[in-house]
Structure formats: structure tokens, C-alpha cells
Amino acid sequence: MELIEVNFNDEGDIIDTLSGKILKDTPEERVRQRFINILQSDYGYPKNIIAREVPVQQGSKILSSDDGAEIRADIVVYTSKKACLERDQGNILFVVECKKPNATEGYSQLVSYIFNTSAVGGVWTNGNGISVYKKKTGGEVGLDEILTLPRYRENWSGSDSIPSKSELPRPHNVRFLLSSCHNKLYGRGMENEDFDLAMDMVRNLLAKIQDETTPGEFPRFWITENDFQTAEGRKHAATEIQKLFREYADQFPD
């Protein structure tokens, strides 16, 4: 499907992409509406399993704030259409916490939503970047940050398999991906005085172009979820990307 930007009526109010209801235009609502569309266009989640502003229960009681207002998850993705229609907290796949651009808080809220529902994980986004978490396994309590949000029907447990180039999904919201990449690199480079963010972005893009345009069934610009969890795996992926950039640069020495 094509990416749909935020819809507004003639009065400047937001038209909810899920229900058609009229909503107040706020920075946070814009982030939420855009991410609902990204879930569909880039990750393949059907519209009929996505819900906006869902009350979160603790046992049989709906959680509330200090002032008595219901606590609601910004976006909930259910396991099925039926679960979404019934707002079945026992069949939630993951939850999303949305914040206005440049905000950094909200992790503790996301944790609360995940552990009070059946969710296997959750997403935090401020529209400029995204962090994805899943529940720890093996009896441990807590969350692990994972590399990327699984697409619809993909396994949240991660995989060592690498898809062929022909199987790679085509992103629709490239601006969001570039913004996320920028923010990850910025966070990594803040402690390095010699870090050149713009050039690192360019090097990564050129390495990706080299990988996409050279023969070979499988991508080299790739890291598996299991490799991402180890320093050795991340180092190997970084080395391969550096090789790709050098291959590109050698073709255009000037």
C-alpha cells in the first residue's frame, strides 16, 4: 500500500486513519498517525488488527493515573481481527508508545504496558527514531532491545537466516528510516570528538548501494538478530560494511 500522510479536515483537525474520527492536532498525535501508517505500509500489519488509545488493565482493573484518568496505550497491535474488535488484552502482540518529536521519556510507560498485557514486546518512537524491545526468555524478567520491528507474521525470537536480495522488503517511508539511522549514529558518536555524522551517513548509504548493485544472491549489508546481541557479531557486520564502502570508493577514486 502507499504511505498515507496525516489527514486533516478543513478546520485543521486530524482525521484518524483507523476510525475516521476527528482528533485534535497535536505533535504527539501526528507521530501516532504516521506510525500507524508505517505499520501498514512498511511492516505489513493489517489495519483491522491495529487500535489507537487502548485502556490497559491490571488484572480486572483498568490502570489509572494519579488524577484518576484511564491509562491508555498509544497504539496496540493484536494477534487477530477478532481480538482487536473485542479489545482482548490476552491477545495483544505488541504495544507502541508515541512521543512528540525530540522527546526522550516514555520507556517506563512502555514497560508497564508490556508486562500488564500478553504483549511479546513493544515499540518506542518520537517520529524521528524507533526503539524495539521484546520480553526476555528463559524465565528472566525484563526486556531486550532488538534490532528491528518484525514484519507481520515474522517471528519475534530472531533468526540466523539471511533473506535473498529478491526477498528484501521495499520501504515506503525512507525519510523515517534515514531519520532513525541518523539518530542511532548521533547517539553512538556523541562521545567521539572526531565523529563526522554526515560522512558516516554517506558511507553507509554508499555501502548499501554497492551491496544492492553488485551480483550475489544474498546481501552482505546485513546483521542477524543473534549477531546483533554480541560484540563479535556487531564487529563482523561493521567490517563487512566497511569493505563494501571501500569497494565502492575504489570504483570512483576521485
Question: Where are the model-predicted features located?
Answer:
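Non-catalytic, mostly N-terminal accessory regions of nucleic-acid modification and defense proteins
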Residues: 1-254
